[in-house]
Amino acid sequence: MQTHEIRKRFLDHFVKAGHTEVPSASVILDDPNLLFVNAGMVQFVPYFLGQRTPPWDRATSVQKCIRTPDIDEVGITTRHNTFFQMAGNFSFGDYFKKGAIELAWSLLTNPVSEGGYGFDPERLWATVYLDDDEAIELWQEVAGLPAERIQRRGMADNYWSMGIPGPCGPCSEIYYDRGPDYGIDGGPEANEDRYIEIWNLVFMQNERGEGTSKDDFEILGPLPRKNIDTGMGVERIACLLQGVDNVYETDLVRPVIDLVAGIAPRGYGQGNHTDDVRYRIIGDHSRTAAIIIGDGVTPGNEGRGYVLRRLLRRIIRAAKLLGVEQPIMGELMATVRDEMGPSYPELVTDFERINRIAIAEETAFNRTLTAGSRLFEDAAETTRKAGSTVLSGDDAFTLHDTFGFPIDLTLEMAAEAGLSVDEEGFRGLMAEQRRRAKADAAARKQAHTDLSAYRELVDAGPTEFTGFDELTTEARILGIFVDGRRVPVVSHVQGGDAPGRVELILNRSPFYAESGGQIADEGTVTGTGASQTAKAAVTDVQKIAKTLWAHRITVESGEFVEGDTIVAAVDPRWRHGATQGHSGTHMVHAALRQVLGPNAVQAGSLNRPGYLRFDFNWQGALSDDQRSQIEEVTNEAVEADYEVHNFTTELEKAKSMGAMALFGENYPDEVRVVEIGGPFSIELCGGTHVRSSAQIGPVTILGESSVGSGVRRVEAYVGLDSFRHLAKERALMAGLASSLKVPSDEVPARVENLVERLRAAEKELDRLRLVNARAAAANAAAGAEQIGGIRLVAQRMAGGISAGDLRSLVGDIRGKLGSDPAVVALISEADDDTVPFVVAVNQAAQDRGLRANDLVKVLGAAVNGRGGGKADLAQGSGKGAAGIDAALAAIRAEMGRS
């Protein structure tokens, strides 16, 4: 049974049982605790926790999942995979243990003719949590399982959670006995190679806290209601139903391996374990990489981007070690698309981007690998000659810093060469590099590279900030600096046309210097008296040693001389926008704490005219209801027109008043307090603010996202920018309503209806294509040619037939041709203009010397493509549809020569 059929039967079974089919979520969810989605229930967590009301009582899905902790084991064992599909059924306060067991058992054991998988009930076992007597009774009552095929196991095996705080509960796992060829008797407790887990039924009833291991965490209490979460491994079921030992031999992975085997000088499964590991790495990682890119990740040096980059680079290196010299990534991605596209349409619709990203990484890494490998070999040789088995941290750092080798790749190559790596030395050099980079960035941010140049001015005293009381100030120029060098004068030529950073240090300034999350003011400085022709735009203001204001300027006319008196003027519109943003930040902070509670503590902020960004400590994404509440509370406070008071007081007194302070920040003994609406908001703050909350204008929350583990970010527009954003959305909605010919409030329902109709139409189109193709295949089988005593079906199928469908049709035809020597060759033109083709050769024809993996190359040559496979079945893909007829003629000619 093919994998697509396994998926379909699962979903059909549960839809008939009253479940709503829910599409797979992206493998990227907005949860800082979760790198990738690793279980089918992840998208339903808010429903299990009672944070949101589920739109259905029962749901079913097949979720794409990524697990990468054991990436180094992929291929070495046949148990580890980075991508898998988890089929699941979910109950939200509806049925519980009995219903879950009944539904799982019927699907597994019902005959294939009745929509089930047809497993022999006598080969199925169950495990339950230690004290779950109810589950044991239900297995005996519902499934008729004898007590000797039900085993109790501890928390590590039969109490499920995601490994992080969230829903959890006891579980019951279903195992299939593969027979004595795979190990000793005694059930799952004795041997999990013989007894393979195929389905986990989780009785989700509790919420867990932090913990140190799978069986060491705190149970916080019961969930609002009892739920069911089950997970059936699609790939494991495919292995059993297809009669193969591991996922690499199944119908969705083997084509990737066969593709590479058709190119590499050494084949797969020829007794070379090292080569087989490399083939499996390519087969596994290609699927995972395509899925991750399809869900929006691009290669990078951190987090998910780093995982993707590592997967792609492991593919490339494995191919090189197999002797593949040509670029191969494009063909790998196309094969994954052909096999997985029917289940995950984004692999088809977004293929151009997926392919482009994968090929770009291949191109870049090929250059890196060539140069870096030479350096690695030299370093390894030097290490051996020195009588050592440890590659130095210096060498590992050079590979990383110069050639972009991640430490994981160096460790992998070293292990293959019989060496280890001085990881501690490497980490020390990396830490030193980060320290230097941080220091350089800080120097650039402060707009100076040599503090000694400013020392005289720093010692003379601070810049007096007048911006709380006025926007225009008469001031004296204390110093002029160009690229950190003190100069006596700067003119229009130097400041306006010549490159360089020009700064004025003033004794007094109305300009707010960037700090506390508020960006600097902009405005002008102009000369007075004899220097009145001098004018410059102020584009940035930074603090030097926290006391001097360095005004970055662009001189527009005249010249500025140290000691001159000038007029510094802040742009009033800029300042008004900045005050709106900063006061809006305080309002959003207060609203967050009102809605979420006191644990929503500020972790950082940024505000500029018309915009604010606020980071806060919080575990998990906010619900739509919470976001709406925060926005509403904020705007209610704006409408209330609260007065804004600023005053200076002692730090301890401010804290006793309840003033919020940024954790980790050092404050002086005397602090400035900003109070909005009495108790609504009171914070320590040195920024500029509106005089009353109504001056902020409307606040529109744009979104909420994760910026790190346990830190969330809210972004919003304020004032006129908020109005413009709302006007733009209103115009967009009006345009949609006009195009859809419905009132605005009916647009969501109309769009959902259209999407459902489109999906149904696409599904029906695929069904009709396959029906027509099966009819054509039946006719082709009936009209098989005879060439040299061998029956041949060489047929061009209708357009739009995928590679997976071709394989299914080949199987149908081969079955109809009986046991006489027969060859089936089918070719088609897919929707994306590629030309997939499949060749099957039965055993009788193989005995006559024919091989599918030879004949497939004949087809490939005619359509500008290539292929590979085994003696009985091979497939490939090309790009030249014009050559299809020639390809079929070539097959006939080749048969005539055999």
Swiss-Prot record:
GO BP terms, alphabetized: alanyl-tRNA aminoacylation
UniProt entry keywords in alphabetical sequence: Aminoacyl-tRNA synthetase, ATP-binding, Cytoplasm, Ligase, Metal-binding, Nucleotide-binding, Protein biosynthesis, RNA-binding, tRNA-binding, Zinc
SUPFAM superfamilies from the UniProt entry: Class II aaRS and biotin synthetases, Putative anticodon-binding domain of alanyl-tRNA synthetase (AlaRS), ThrRS/AlaRS common domain, Translation proteins
Binding-site positions, Zn(2+): H582, H586, C685, H689
Catalytic activity field: tRNA(Ala) + L-alanine + ATP = L-alanyl-tRNA(Ala) + AMP + diphosphate
CDD domains cross-referenced by the UniProt entry: AlaRS_core (cd00673)
EC number(s) from the headed UniProt entry: 6.1.1.7
Range of residues in the leader sequence: none
Any one of the GO CC terms: cytosol
Molecular function in Gene Ontology: alanine-tRNA ligase activity; aminoacyl-tRNA deacylase activity; ATP binding; tRNA binding; zinc ion binding
Record flagged with keyword Electron transport: no
Compartment(s) where it occurs, according to its Swiss-Prot or TrEMBL record: Cytoplasm
Cofactor dependence: Zn(2+)
Enzyme's top EC category: ligase
SMART domains attached to this UniProt entry: tRNA_SAD
Function: Catalyzes the attachment of alanine to tRNA(Ala) in a two-step reaction: alanine is first activated by ATP to form Ala-AMP and then transferred to the acceptor end of tRNA(Ala). Also edits incorrectly charged Ser-tRNA(Ala) and Gly-tRNA(Ala) via its editing domain.
Family: Belongs to the class-II aminoacyl-tRNA synthetase family.
Domain notes per entry: Consists of three domains; the N-terminal catalytic domain, the editing domain and the C-terminal C-Ala domain. The editing domain removes incorrectly charged amino acids, while the C-Ala domain, along with tRNA(Ala), serves as a bridge to cooperatively bring together the editing and aminoacylation centers thus stimulating deacylation of misacylated tRNAs.
Protein name: Alanine--tRNA ligase
Gene name in the database record: alaS
